[in-house]
Amino acid sequence: LAGGATINRFFNQEVIKAVWPIWLGYLPLGFAGGVLAQKVGLTPGETGLMSLLVFAGSGQFIALAMMGGGAASITSIVMTTFIVNLRHLLYSSTLASYLMEASKKYLGTFAQGITDETFAVNLNKFTEKESDWNADKALGVNVLAHACWIFSNVLGNIVGNVVSIDMAVVSYTLTAMFIGLWSFHFEHKLLIIVGVFSGFLALSLSSVLDHKLHIVVATLLAATVGCAAESWCIKK
């Protein structure tokens, strides 16, 4: 009974309800990642290990593409993946304010599961009015999302020889899912303005900044403008 109660803290109906939209996006994208890994020469076990250690869709796809090219060194792959995922620093620092009482062991486990989608879901749940969302439920979302990612990658690798996938369609799945996760924030005018500004800024910077640094820079600049605008509105 005690064990069941402990598990229920992390994996319950509320957590499942929060994470299922992520599953819908991760299944096709992870499957495509597994197919690509199979084409590069990775076994199902190696693909599963990579998905466990590199829980980042864009980072994993870029790493696989570089591995497939044959000319990239381990150092260049690691550094490129690190730069591409720098935005996770912003995500973790934002969520940290809701996890002030968590242990270092918890934070290490939680940080491994932060992605664009788990960040969006957890931040939305933490900021809901009269929310009872807590660190255990947030970790449950991360773990279940990560498990789905590993499963879909391994499955894609296993059947990679007999499946052909249109990567353009698959890549849009994640974009559509992320927009859906943030859709209920559209009632806040300032967030809409900042979001649109950030999008246009990212597009403008994409031609001059490599390795997706334009996303990090655009996010920081837009967030700064948003904070300044919010402070001005409050004072006014």
Where in this protein do the model-derived segments appear?
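Helical membrane-embedded segments and adjacent short helical loop/helix-boundary regions
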Residues: 12-29, 42-56, 164-180, 184-191, ...
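Helix-loop-helix junctions within the multi-pass membrane cores of secondary transporters/permeases
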Residues: 7-8, 78-171
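C-terminal ends of transmembrane helices
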Residues: 90-98, 123-126, 180-187, 225-236
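Helix-loop-helix hairpins and the membrane-proximal interhelical loops
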Residues: 2-54, 65-81, 235-236
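Alpha-helical transmembrane segments of multipass membrane proteins
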Residues: 31-35, 62, 121, 154, ...
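Alpha-helical transmembrane segments and their membrane-interface exit regions
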Residues: 55-59, 83-90, 176-182, 202-204, ...
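Membrane-embedded alpha-helical modules
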Residues: 133-217
